[in-house]
Every structure is written in structure tokens, then in C-alpha cells.
């Protein structure tokens, strides 16, 4: 058994290029940047920030969504597979390119953050919004009964941190 699964959260480096074919299928390509923060080791050594650029490929329905809603600077959550292909350049040298073929995408940028204020988001993002709204409400509902209980019975006091 083997697993080929990639999960990325990053920023779109340039507006996607989308090609539509006579068959009705579409392919979108764009670069995505992921950045590891810089930090300082205990001995004072500075580790600089590091940015990786990933070649992203989306096809069919995802390519259409990318065409309509994804722009340079947008923050995306992507799931997909990594693939490497090769080709010969003009001088005959063999070149290799590694790409991420997207299976799932979630837009993390707020509506209208980078382009056209009020631009509609794809349905996948709209489906996420109600879940995000419910999550803050659940802890509030749980917190109300625990406030009514005596402090010694509060399970939050038993936390190890």
C-alpha cells in the first residue's frame, strides 16, 4: 500500500491560467507559495524565513471554480496528489517538473479581500461558513452551564496546563 496525499495552505502567486478544451474540460494552473517562519535557536542562531513555490493544477469543475474565484494573493487550502513529469527543452536537455494535482480546495481569504469587493465565493466556501459560525456558538453554550456549577466541579480546572 502507498499514499500520495498533499495538503497545502498558502497564497496564490499570480492569477491562474485556465485553458478550456473542445471536449468541455478545463485545466487551471497557478503557483502557490507556502512559507515557514524564521526563528532563533536557543544558541542564538537565526534560521531565516523560507518560502516554497508549488505548481498547482486543477481540472474540470475545480478549474472552472479557480477561473471564477481565485486571484493573485488569495489564501487557499488545497488537498491533492504530487506528480512529476518530464519533457525535453529546446536544447534537448531533459527537464522535470513537480506539480500538485488538486482534489479538494477551500478558499480561506475573506470575500472581496484581494479583488472585486462583494465577489461571490464558490459553493464549497459558502458551505464552510455556517460551520465556522456554529463553532464559536458551541463553546459559548457549554460555558454557560459550567458557570452555574460550583468551581470545584468545573472540569476546566482539571486541565494539565
From Swiss-Prot:
Q: Which Gene3D superfamilies match?
A: Nucleic acid-binding proteins
List the keywords (alphabetical). Answer: DNA-binding
Q: Which GO terms describe its biological process?
A: DNA replication
CDD domains hit by this protein? SSB_OBF
Regions of biased composition (Low complexity) lie at 119-152
* Protein's UniProt keywords contain DNA-binding: yes
Q: Outline the subunit composition.
A: Homotetramer.
UniProt cross-references to NCBIfam families, sorted A to Z? ssb
This one is known as Single-stranded DNA-binding protein
Source organism: Bacteroides thetaiotaomicron (strain ATCC 29148 / DSM 2079 / JCM 5827 / CCUG 10774 / NCTC 10582 / VPI-5482 / E50)
Organism lineage reads as: Bacteria, Pseudomonadati, Bacteroidota, Bacteroidia, Bacteroidales
